[in-house]
Structure formats: structure tokens, C-alpha cells
Amino acid sequence: MSAAPKTRPKYYDLNLAHLPPPGLVSILHRISGAALFFPLLPIALYILHVTLGSQEGYDRWAALFHRPGVKLIVILAAWGYAHHFFAGLRYLLLDLHIGIEKVPARTSAVIVLVLGVVSALFVAWYMWSIQ
Amino acid sequence: MKRYTKHPVGAHYGTRQWLLQRLTAVVMAGYTLFIVLALVMHRPLNYPAWKSIFSEMWFQVGTMLFVMALLYHAWVGMRDILMDYLRDTTVRLTAQFAVAFVLLFYLVWTAAILWGR
């Protein structure tokens, strides 16, 4: 009686721009979380290790942070952390049944996306201000 | 109308992990605010200031607690991701083992950075 299962067409819409804001927040929360686990955390630990280790190590990294490419990576990493942070706060509120309706959930998703970018801009300002 | 009561099966560790992932998130969020505040207050940053932040006992303990919370939080999160995308049990369990090993490595490394010299 058991026939071979029908092969169904598969279609993955990988274009994130098609997602509504809550969906975008969700997938970016997942991607940023994975990126924080690897490679961002070991990189951060390595920098902490070297910069706390000696004045020379600190100076070496202080010089590296002057490079635009390194600044860009730090800003991207900060954006990933901030997005994960604010998206996580939003999920905590949703878990408490706060803002769970469609319209407020969409609004809060947009706020999370904006706050992530604002935090990245703040880190950019900080890096240029300490020179 | 017949009503069904769902009988939950399993060891219930899913609920516990779900809750602990959120509790660890709150711990890490608190630490995040502290370190942002510390960095802003010590601006412009230099080696003695950077060193003094991390030589404070409470900050060392806070950093260690942060990484311990992160260990559990990231374990639950990475396990969720691996369960979603890796269907083959052998591959998934190998990946989970690698994640657990890496997380323990981070924990020990953090302790070494904080108190290793």
C-alpha cells in the first residue's frame, strides 16, 4: 500500500527583502547569534588576551583600530551584537505577552532594526572619538 | 465534544532550557550595559585605564559570569540551529559535540585571560 513518497517541488525564498519586519528581525537574530558564537567571540577574546597582556600588545591593536577596514569589521560586529541584544529584548517582551498583536509586533520589529543601526553608528562615533 | 488533554512527553528539559536561555540573556544584557558605560567613562582609552577596568574584582567576576551565561545561552541557541538544519544524526551530534567543546574552550580561555598572570 505504501507508495514511494511523491517528490514535491521545493522553493526556498532566500531573498530577505521579501520578509516582513518581524521575519527579518528573526533571521538576523539567528545569523547574528551564530556569528557571535563563531568567529566574533574568539576574535574578541583574542583581542582581550593581547591588549591586556602587555603595553606592546595594546599599542599594536590600538594601531590596527586606526585602519578603516578594521573599523568597518568592528562596526559590523557591533551591529550584530546590538541587533541580537535588541531582538532578544523584544522576544523577552513577547514572551511576557507584551506587544504580541500584529501591529505592535511589526512596530517593535522596526524599532529593533533601527536600534541595531543606531548602536552601530554609536560605536562608529566612539571609535573615531578616542583617537 | 471530546476534549483532549495533551500529555507532555520527554524529560521536560526543553522548557528548562527555554527559560534558562532567557535568564542568561538578562545576565548578559546587564553586563553589556556595564561595559558600555565603563568604556564611555574611560574615554579616551589607554593601556593603564584598560588594565585597571579588568583588574577590578567585581568586573572580573562579572566577566566570568557573563561568559558562563553565554556558554549556556549559546549552547541552547546553537543546538536549535543545528537541529533545524542538520538532519543526519551522526553529523548533528558531531557538530553539537564540536560546539560544546568550543564553548568550554572559551570559558577556560576567559579564566586564563582574567587570572592567568
State what each model feature region is.
Chain A
Residues M1-Q131:
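Membrane-embedded alpha-helical bundles that constitute the cytochrome b-like, heme-associated redox core
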